[in-house]
UniProtKB/Swiss-Prot annotation:
It is a multi-pass membrane protein. It comes from Oryctolagus cuniculus (Rabbit). The keyword Cytoplasm does not apply. This is Chloride channel protein ClC-Kb. It catalyses: chloride(in) = chloride(out); iodide(out) = iodide(in); nitrate(in) = nitrate(out); bromide(in) = bromide(out). Residues 1-50, 521-678 are cytoplasmic. Chloride binds at S121, F426. Its main location: membrane. It is found in: Basolateral cell membrane. The keyword Calcium applies. Expressed predominantly in the kidney.
Length: 678
C-alpha cells in the first residue's frame, strides 16, 4: 500500500507524507533536521574520519582506565583479605587460591557461553581477518560485553595467573572500530566499502596497544609488524592520530584522578644520562639478545606443542569440549598453589603485582652487590620503599630467585595460554625477558664490581639497563617484531639505552625468525585458521621455485556453450565455491568467474524451462541475470614463488588462476602455497 501524501501549507505543490504533516511540531522538527544537516556539512568539510578516529581513541582510553581503576581496587581487596584472615595456613591458602579459581572459572564460563570467539588473545584471528579472510560474527558488537567481563575477571586475579590485557584489548578496540565504521557509513550515507572498513580496523588495532601502555608510536608500529606483512602508508596518519588521542586521554585521566602530577611514562626509571653504559658492554647486550632469541625459540616450540597436545589429547579435548570452566579451574588451582607466598611463591616474588615486577627489575642498583655483606629481611608485607627485597632469599640469593622465577614462569605461562578465557600474553613475556636481562646484568655486576674500564674511566654496570634490553629482546623475538624496543623506551621514558637495546632486539629476532614462527602465527597454525604461510628465512633455493612446481593440476571449468546437464554434473561432482568461466570448451579462454551459490540459485529458477524439454546452455542462464565477476589478475606458470606470495599478501587474495596464453590452466591458493616446503 502506497503511503498517503499531501501538500505543505504554502507550498508550490511538492508532496509530503501525511505522517510528517500529522507528527507533533512539524516545523520545529524540520528546522532541527535542517540545522543538523547544516552542522554535519560544516563539520565533515575537513573530513569525517577525524571525528570517528578521535572518538575511537577517547572511548578506548576511557574503557582502559576504568578497567584499571576498578580492578586495582579489587586486587587490593584480595590482598587485604589474605592479610587480615589470620595466621592459619589453611585459611590463608584458601583465600589465596579460591579467589582466582572462582574468577577464572567465571571468566571462562561466561565468555564462552556468550560467544566462542571471546577466548584467548584475539590477535591471531584479527591477523587472519586483515589478510582477507571473513570470520563470521567475530567483530560483532554483541561480543564486546562478553570480552570485557571475561577480561576483567582474568585481570582481577592479579599476578597469580600472570596474564595481561594487550591482545584482548586490541580485539575490543577493533570491535569498536568496526562498529564506528558502520555508524560512519550510515551517517554520511555511502555504501559499505571494504577498504574503508580495513582502515578503521587497522586504526583500532593501534589504539588497543596505545591505550594499554600509553605508547602511541610503538602501538602503531607494533600493529604494523604483527598484523600484516604489508602496510599502506595511507593508514599511517589514521593509526597515529587515533593512537595519540587514546594515549593522551589515558594519561590525562590519571592526572585528573590525582594519580600523577603531570603526563609521564608508566614506569619511572633513574638511569644516569651522562654515561649509561660503556662501549665494551655492547658485546654483552648482543649476547643478551642471542640468549633471548634461543630462549624464545624454546618457548615458542613448547607453547605450540603443548597447545596442540591439549587439542589432540582425548581426555583434555573432551574436558575442553564439555566443561571449559572445569579445565580453567583445575589449571588456575595449579598456578595459584605454586604462587602461594609461604610456599614456593616465596622464591618467585609472588607478592608483587605485574607492575611492581617491572618497577623492581628496572632498578638501576645491583642487588647482588647490595646483599653481598648484609641480608635484607623478608617483611610480613612488601615494603613500598624496598620492593626488591621480595627477590631475595638468604638460601637462594638473588641469582637463585631470578633463575627459579624464569624456570617456573616459563612453563606456567605455557599452561596459562591453554585456558579458554580472554587473556593477553604480551606483558608476561615482557616481564620474563626483563628477568633474563636482570639475571645477566647481576652476573656482570658481580664479575665487574667496580665497573668496566673504558677510556680510563670506570663506570658501574646497571642491571636495570640489561633488564630493559632483555624485556624488549625476548618479547620482540616471541612476536617477531622490532617495535618492542621503542615500546620499552615509551614505557620508561628513557632512551639512553637506545643503541644497545635495538642491537639486542635485532640479534634476538635474527635467531627467532629463522627458527620458529611467531607466537601469533603458531597459534593460527594450531587453531587451523586460514593463513598464508611465511617464507621462513627466504632461502636462496626458494627463488628458483615457480608456480608450475606447486600449482593445482585438476580444475573444473564451465564453458559458455556447455549444456545445462553438463553444468549440473560439474556442480554435483565438485564442491568449489567458484568456477572459472571459459569462452568455449575448445578454446578454454578465461573470461570470468561465476559463484557456485548464485549459479545454483539461477539453475533452480530455470527448472520449469528445463522440465518442458527446451535445450538451453549456460550462456542462457548468464544472460538471464546470473552475475559473473571479471578476472582482474592471473598468474603465469613461470611466475616465481616470491612474486605469487607478494601478490597474495599485498592484495589480500586467497586464490588466483593460472593462465597460459589466455587459456585457463590451473588454480593456486593458500593451500598449494603451504605445500611448497618454504
Amino acid at each position: 500500500m502506497e503511503e498517503l501524501v499531501g501538500l505543505r501549507e504554502g507550498s508550490s505543490g511538492n508532496p509530503v507524507a501525511l505522517r510528517e504533516l500529522w507528527s507533533p511540531c512539524p516545523r520545529l522538527r524540520r528546522g532541527i533536521r535542517g540545522g543538523l544537516e547544516w552542522l554535519k556539512q560544516k563539520l565533515f568539510r575537513v573530513g569525517e574520519d577525524w571525528y570517528f578516529l578521535m572518538t575511537l581513541g577517547v572511548l578506548m582510553a576511557l574503557i582502559s582506565y576504568a578497567m584499571n581503576f576498578a580492578l586495582g581496587r579489587v586486587v587490593r581487596a584480595h590482598k587485604w583479605l589474605y592479610r587480615e584472615i589470620g595466621d592459619s595456613h589453611l585459611l590463608r591458602y584458601l583465600s589465596w587460591t579460591v579467589y582466582p579459581v572462582a574468577l577464572v572459572s567465571f571468566s571462562s564460563g561466561f565468555s564462552q557461553s556468550i560467544t566462542p570467539f571471546s577466548g584467548g588473545s584475539g590477535i591471531p584471528e584479527l591477523k587472519t581477518i586483515l589478510s582477507g579472510v571473513v570470520l563470521e560474527n567475530y567483530l560483532d558488537i554483541k561480543n564486546f560485553g562478553a570480552k570485557v567481563v571475561g577480561l576483567s575477571c582474568t585481570l582481577a586475579t592479579g599476578s597469580t595467573l600472570f596474564l595481561g590485557k594487550v591482545g584482548p584489548f586490541v580485539h575490543l578496540s577493533v570491535m569498536i572500530a568496526a562498529y564506528l565504521g558502520r555508524v560512519r557509513t550510515k551517517t554520511i550515507g555511502e555504501a559499505e566499502n571494504k577498504s574503508k572498513q580495513n582502515e578503521m580496523l587497522v586504526a583500532g588495532a593501534a589504539v588497543g596497544v596505545a591505550t594499554v601502555f600509553a605508547a602511541p608510536f610503538s602501538g602503531v608500529l607494533f600493529c604494523i609488524e604483527v598484523m600484516s606483512s604489508h602496510f599502506s602508508v595511507w593508514d599511517y596518519w589514521r593509526g597515529f592520530f587515533a593512537a595519540t588521542c587514546g594515549a593522551f586521554m589515558f594519561r590525562l585521566l590519571a592526572v585528573f584522578n590525582s594519580e600523577q602530577e603531570t603526563i609521564t611514562s608508566l614506569y619511572k626509571t633513574s638511569f644516569p644520562v651522562d654515561v649509561p653504559f660503556d662501549l665494551p658492554e655492547i658485546f654483552f647486550f648482543v649476547l643478551l639478545g642471542a640468549i633471548c632469541g634461543v630462549a624464545s625459540c624454546a618457548y615458542l616450540y613448547c607453547q605450540r606443542t603443548f597447545l596442540a597436545f591439549t587439542k589432540t589429547n582425548k581426555l583434555i579435548s573432551k574436558l575442553m569440549a564439555t566443561s571449559k570452566p572445569l579445565y580453567a579451574a583445575l589449571a588456575a588451582t595449579v598456578l595459584a598453589s605454586i604462587t602461594y607466598p609461604p610456599g614456593v611463591g616465596r622464591f618467585m616474588a609472588s607478592r608483587l603485582s605485574m607492575r611492581e615486577h617491572l618497577d623492581t627489575l628496572f632498578d638501576n642498583h645491583s642487588w647482588a652487590l647490595l646483599t653481598r655483606n648484609s641480608s635484607p629481611p623478608w617483611p610480613a608485607e612488601p615494603d613500598p620503599q624496598h620492593l626488591w627485597w621480595e627477590w631475595y632469599h638468604p638460601r637462594f640469593t638473588i641469582f637463585g630467585t631470578l633463575a627459579f622465577f624464569l624456570v617456573m614462569k616459563f612453563w606456567m605461562l605455557i599452561l596459562a595460554t591453554t585456558i579458554p578465557m580472554p587473556a593477553g600474553y604480551f606483558l608476561p613475556i615482557f616481564i620474563i625477558g626483563a628477568a633474563i636481562g636482570r639475571l645477566l646484568g647481576e652476573a656482570l655486576s658481580v664479575a665487574f664490581p667496580e665497573g668496566i674500564v673504558a677510556g680510563g674511566v670506570i663506570n658501574p654496570i646497571m642491571p636495570g639497563g640489561y633488564a630493559l634490553a632483555g624485556a624488549a629482546a625476548f618479547s620482540g623475538a616471541v612476536t617477531h617484531s622490532i617495535s618492542t624496543a621503542l615500546l620499552a623506551f615509551e614505557l620508561t621514558g628513557q632512551i639512553v639505552h637506545a643503541l644497545p637495546v635495538l642491537m639486542a632486539v635485532l640479534a634476538a629476532n635474527a635467531i627467532a625468525q629463522s627458527c620458529q614462527p611467531s607466537f601469533y602465527d603458531g597459534t593460527i597454525m594450531v587453531k587451523k585458521l586460514p593463513y598464508l604461510p611465511w617464507i621462513r628465512g627466504r632461502p636462496i633455493n626458494s627463488h628458483r621455485v615457480i608456480v608450475e612446481h606447486f600449482m593445482r593440476r585438476a580444475i573444473s571449468t564451465l564453458a559458455r556453450d556447455a549444456a545445462l546437464e553438463q553444468v549440473v554434473k560439474v556442480l554435483t561432482s565438485t564442491d568449489e565455491a567458484e568456477y572459472p568461466l571459459v569462452e568455449s570448451t575448445e578454446s578454454q579462454l578465461l573470461v570470468g568467474i561465476v559463484q557456485r551459490a548464485q549459479l545454483v540459485q539461477a539453475l533452480q529458477a530455470e527448472a520449469p524451462a528445463r522440465a518442458s524439454g527446451q535445450q538451453r546452455c549456460l550462456q542462457d542462464i548468464l544472460a538471464g541475470g546470473c552475475p559473473t565477476e571479471p578476472v582482474t589478475l592471473t598468474l603465469s606458470p613461470e611466475t616465481s614463488l616470491h612474486q605469487a606470495h607478494n601478490l597474495f599478501e599485498l592484495l589480500n587474495l586467497r586464490s588466483l588462476y593460472v593462465t597460459s596464453k589466455g587459456r585457463a590452466v590451473v588454480y593456486v591458493s593458500w593451500v598449494e602455497r603451504q605445500h611448497t616446503g618454504f
